[in-house]
Design a protein with these regions (language model features):
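Bacterial N-terminal signal peptides
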Residues: 9-16
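Non-catalytic cap/lid and distal C-terminal segments of serine-dependent acyl enzymes
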Residues: 22-321
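Bacterial N-terminal signal peptides that target proteins for export
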Residues: 1-8
Length: 321
C-alpha cells in the first residue's frame, strides 16, 4: 500500500512539474523507430521535445529487447543523442554503440535493468548548452568578452545557457520520462553521461542537481573549454575551483573520468590529474571515483565505443543481494 501511495504522490508531482514548465503532454510527438534499423533493442523517438528553456530537440529512448512495463527501470541520460546508436545516421559514420553494449551487459547480468535517454544536441547551440554556466560567470572580464565575441562570430546569441539546458532536463524531460515509462526515480537510479563538452555538462549536472543524479560519466572531458590550450586560458582552473565548492557527497554519488592520449585528448592529462586531486580532497575513493587513461585512443566516437562498457558498468552495476 505504501508503495502505491508513493507512486501516486510521485505521479502528481511529476505532472505538476510538467504543468509548471508549460510542457503540455499532448504537444509531444513520439514514434517507434524503423525495426529494420541495425539496433539491438528498440528506440522510441520524441520529435522536437518542446521546451521553454532551450530550442526543441529530438530525444531517443532506448529499451532493451525484453522491456517489460510491469518492471521498473533505472535511467541513463546521455548527451549528443544522435551519435549513440546508428553509424549510418551520423555525420561522421561513427557511433557509441550504446544499444550493443547495453544489450550485451544486460544479457550478462552485469547491469541494473536500464533504459537510455539520448538527448540530441542542436549543433549551433551545443557549446552554449554544454559549457558550465557558473564557470563562465566566474571567469575574468577579459575571458568572458573573448568567449562572447567568439559566439557572435558564429552567429550564436550567447556563449553559454547551460543552466537553462539543465532546467530542460530536470524540470521538463525527466518528469515526462518518469510519468510515461516505468522508471525508478531516485538519484541512485538516475545517471548522466557525455563526452568532450558533453562530459563537462554531465559533470556540471551532478554538481548542480545532486538530488537528481547519483552518478556521472565524463569521457574525454574537454577541460580547456575552447580549442585554446594557451597559458592565458583560465577555464580549467576555474572549473577546478567550481568543483572544490560544488562536488556532491561521495557517500551517495560516483563520478567516472577517462581520456585518451591522441588528438584532442592529448591535451587533457595535466587537467585530468588536477580533477582527480580535487575529488580526492573531497574524500572520493576507488568506490566513488574512476579516472582511466586509454593509450592510443583519440577524441572520437569509435574510441568511446571501444571503452563504453567500462563507464556503463561503473554507473549501472547490478546490485547483488
Amino acid at each position: 500500500m505504501l508503495l502505491n501511495q508513493n507512486y501516486i504522490l510521485f505521479f502528481f508531482l511529476s505532472v505538476n512539474m510538467l504543468w509548471a514548465s508549460c510542457t503540455p503532454l499532448d504537444s509531444i510527438t513520439t514514434y517507434w523507430m524503423n525495426p529494420t534499423q541495425k539496433i539491438e533493442g528498440n528506440i522510441k523517438r520524441i520529435e522536437k521535445f518542446p521546451s521553454k528553456f532551450v530550442t526543441p530537440r529530438n530525444v531517443d529512448i532506448w529499451f532493451p529487447k525484453d522491456f517489460d512495463n510491469t518492471k521498473t527501470y533505472s535511467v541513463l541520460y546521455m548527451q549528443d543523442g544522435q551519435m549513440l546508436f546508428d553509424a549510418d545516421k551520423t555525420w561522421n559514420g561513427q557511433e557509441w554503440g550504446v544499444d550493443e553494449h547495453m544489450s550485451l551487459l544486460l544479457n550478462d547480468s552485469k547491469l541494473k535493468e536500464t533504459i537510455v535517454v539520448g538527448i540530441w544536441n542542436v549543433y549551433s547551440e551545443r557549446n552554449a548548452n554544454y559549457f558550465p554556466q557558473k564557470v563562465f560567470e566566474a571567469l575574468d572580464k577579459e575571458n568572458k568578452v573573448a568567449l562572447q565575441r567568439m559566439a557572435k562570430k558564429k552567429n550564436q546569441e550567447t556563449f553559454v545557457n547551460s543552466d537553462n539546458y539543465l532546467k530542460f532536463i530536470v524540470s521538463e524531460l525527466k518528469p515526462y520520462i518518469d510519468i510515461t515509462f516505468p522508471t525508478k526515480t531516485s538519484p541512485e537510479d538516475t545517471a548522466i553521461m557525455g563526452s568532450s563538452r558533453g562530459a563537462l555538462i554531465s559533470l556540471y549536472a551532478i554538481c548542480e542537481y545532486p538530488e537528481v543524479f547519483g552518478a556521472a560519466a565524463c569521457l574525454s572531458t574537454h577541460w580547456i573549454g575552447t580549442y585554446s590550450n594557451a597559458e592565458s586560458n583560465q577555464i580549467p582552473y576555474v572549473i577546478f575551483d567550481y568543483l572544490m565548492d560544488n562536488l556532491p557527497s561521495p557517500k551517495n554519488h560516483k563520478i567516472y573520468f577517462d581520456y585518451g592520449t591522441q588528438t584532442l585528448d592529448a591535451l587533457y592529462l595535466p587537467y585530468q590529474d588536477l580533477a582527480t586531486t580535487a575529488l580526492e580532497y573531497k574524500s572520493y575513493d576507488d568506490e566513488s571515483m574512476v579516472n582511466l587513461k586509454f593509450d592510443g585512443h583519440e577524441h572520437a566516437e569509435k574510441f568511446w565505443n571501444k571503452r563504453l562498457a567500462t563507464p556503463l558498468t561503473f554507473l549501472l552495476k547490478k546490485d547483488y543481494e
